[in-house]
């Protein structure tokens, strides 16, 4: 079989104007960026305001191996499968970060015959939205250090007299806004800025600083959760950048940088239109990770697609404990649109990995034994799939299991897994997913199950209520959402939660940052663990995004590169074509 990039390169694509017309966009509702990309204006939502929304299908997964289980393949393949059944459909996915592209997982365009195309343009820069987020974020970081420098250099009263601005009196030790970049770079997790030659202060005042990856920026979450440009402007103004010497929050509005940050993101708020290999219109917008952010594409993209098509297929990052939880408790509470159906992607290799019998290391190839028949390992790991089915049903949503088939998979084991699912007393639909090898035709069975599931009654319910305290919400997600026995809070986390409650942020949602490789916060606990303890070590405030961000275990907001990173395989040939991208 051809490589992903060769399949993409040898498949004829339609001009983006044809894809826009197919989606139902008018000529003044999109702007082309080259032959195969366009920026889409949300004005079409106003034009179609009276039109009934389509059905929203959310694709999630079992607890994945480090390489993933084919969620994007399933998302794109399912959209093509629905089209193959003559349904009006669009897909909505996140923009890939270059961190994973050059790091462990590689690209995020899907794979095989279920891809968004051109996949190299999607995976590398696209229309520059992530760079815009990075620039807007770092503008605020520069503004903070500049304000500290000018106020402290002159003295607060002299600064006020000279500028006519109020002194913000920022505490240099309580700046909470780190810088960001769209790469994995562990060396930048902790740095010092403002370093000067002896006796000089020209470079600012020295303080400890650090970098996060751009996907973890609060601005990325704001981009994904904003309903329009004005909403984004208001949210950016609420971002807390630091605290002053009286322990009061200093916002982007107070620093008078919120307007410029919004200007930098003016074009980024427009989703990018592309196409699948079979011509399904696909909106790409925002790129928050699900382990260190809220892990879902944008509300704006969903709203546009739901007005233009009968079915919208989107995905939530990692397993249902991660992206699905955040889709239901953060995204849906903001958009007031719940999924009509949940698709859980399961694989033989992923379930065997959840038996705990294999030693999997991020950045290393999966062991060959995972691809060999092993009924005992499959049966042991099946508990993980049952957990994820139960988890989706906690939210009152119909469930379809898509068994993503790999070429090495045993037909006997595929049949056995399907039988086990059919025997569950949980009213779950199931089908084999062959989108990678066969495109839309290989997804028709899953698509039929999804159509039926979307017509089934749903009774959506989030896990917690806004009026609960932040601590109560975190405990609810950990106990009801993950099944842990005890939640512990570090002294730092306790102090932070008390501060946020006092400052009036108690009604915000909670966004858990934890490993995606276990339902727990310990990546070594496989299957369906219960009774474990989760330690919340730090809680960060994202007032503009509308949540607090609880860090557990050893999760990092700036990833590092593995010993054999994906960038080693990338190059460019004499024709200017990229090679080695997957």
Curated annotation (Swiss-Prot):
Give GO MF terms, alphabetically. ATP binding; formate-tetrahydrofolate ligase activity
Presence of the UniProt keyword ATP-binding in the record: yes
One short Pfam name that applies is: FTHFS
GO biological process, any: tetrahydrofolate interconversion
Give the matching InterPro entries.
Formate_THF_ligase (IPR000559), Formate_THF_ligase_CS (IPR020628), P-loop_NTPase (IPR027417)
Q: Which protein family is named in the record?
A: Belongs to the formate--tetrahydrofolate ligase family.
Indicate what this protein is called per its UniProt record. Answer: Formate--tetrahydrofolate ligase
Q: Which gene encodes it?
A: fhs
């Amino acid at each position: 079989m051809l490589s992903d990039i060769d399949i993409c390169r040898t498949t004829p694509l339609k001009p983006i104007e044809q894809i826009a017309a197919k989606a139902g966009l008018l000529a003044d509702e999109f702007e082309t960026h080259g032959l195969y990309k366009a920026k889409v204006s949300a004005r079409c939502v106003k034009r179609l305001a009276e039109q009934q929304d389509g059905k929203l299908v959310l694709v999630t997964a079992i607890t994945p191996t480090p390489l993933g289980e084919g969620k994007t393949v399933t998302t794109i393949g399912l959209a093509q499968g629905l089209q193959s059944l003559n349904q009006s459909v669009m897909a909505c996915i996140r923009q890939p970060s270059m961190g994973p592209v050059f790091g462990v997982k590689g690209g995020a365009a899907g794979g095989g015959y279920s891809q968004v195309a051109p996949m190299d343009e999607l995976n590398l820069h696209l229309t520059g939205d992530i760079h815009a987020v990075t620039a807007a974020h770092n503008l605020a970081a520069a503004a903070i250090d500049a304000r500290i420098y000018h106020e402290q250099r002159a003295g607060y009263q002299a600064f006020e007299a000279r500028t006519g601005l109020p002194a913000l009196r920022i505490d240099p030790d309580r700046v909470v806004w780190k810088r960001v970049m769209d790469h994995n770079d562990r060396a930048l997790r902790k740095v010092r800025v403002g370093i000067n030659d002896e006796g000089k202060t020209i470079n600012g005042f020295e303080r400890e600083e650090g970098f996060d990856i751009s996907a973890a920026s609060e601005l990325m979450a704001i981009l994904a959760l904003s309903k329009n440009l004005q909403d984004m402007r208001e949210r950016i103004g609420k971002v807390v950048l630091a605290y002053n010497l009286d322990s009061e929050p200093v916002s982007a509005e107070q620093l008078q940088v919120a307007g410029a940050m919004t200007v930098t993101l003016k074009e980024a708020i427009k989703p990018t239109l592309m196409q699948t290999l079979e011509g399904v219109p696909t909106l790409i917008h925002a790129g928050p990770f699900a382990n260190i952010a809220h892990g879902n594409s944008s509300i704006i993209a969903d709203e546009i697609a739901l007005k233009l098509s009968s079915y919208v297929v989107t995905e939530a990052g990692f397993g249902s404990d991660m992206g699905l939880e955040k889709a239901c408790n953060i995204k849906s509470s903001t958009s007031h649109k719940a999924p009509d159906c949940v698709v859980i992607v399961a694989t033989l290799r992923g379930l065997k990995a959840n038996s705990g019998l294999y030693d999997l290391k991020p950045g290393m190839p999966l062991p060959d034994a995972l691809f060999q028949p092993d009924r005992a390992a499959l049966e042991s790991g099946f508990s993980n799939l049952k957990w994820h089915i139960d988890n989706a049903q906690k939210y009152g949503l119909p469930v379809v299991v898509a068994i993503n088939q790999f070429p090495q998979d045993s037909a006997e084991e595929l049949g056995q897994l399907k039988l086990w699912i059919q025997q569950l007393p949980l009213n779950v639909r199931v089908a084999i997913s062959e989108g990678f090898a066969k495109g839309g035709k290989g997804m028709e069975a899953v698509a039929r199950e999804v159509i039926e599931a979307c017509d089934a009654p749903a009774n959506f319910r989030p896990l917690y209520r806004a009026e609960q305290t932040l601590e109560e919400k975190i405990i609810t997600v950990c106990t009801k959402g993950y099944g842990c026995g005890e939640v512990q809070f570090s002294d730092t986390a306790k102090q932070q939660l008390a501060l946020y409650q006092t400052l009036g942020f108690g009604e915000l949602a909670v966004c858990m940052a934890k490993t995606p490789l276990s339902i727990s916060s310990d990546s070594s606990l496989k299957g369906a663990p219960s009774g474990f303890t989760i330690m919340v070590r730090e809680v960060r405030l994202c007032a503009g995004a509308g949540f607090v961000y609880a860090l557990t275990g050893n999760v990092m907001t700036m990833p590092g590169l593995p010993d054999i990173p994906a960038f080693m395989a990338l190059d460019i040939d004499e024709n200017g074509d990229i090679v080695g991208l997957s």
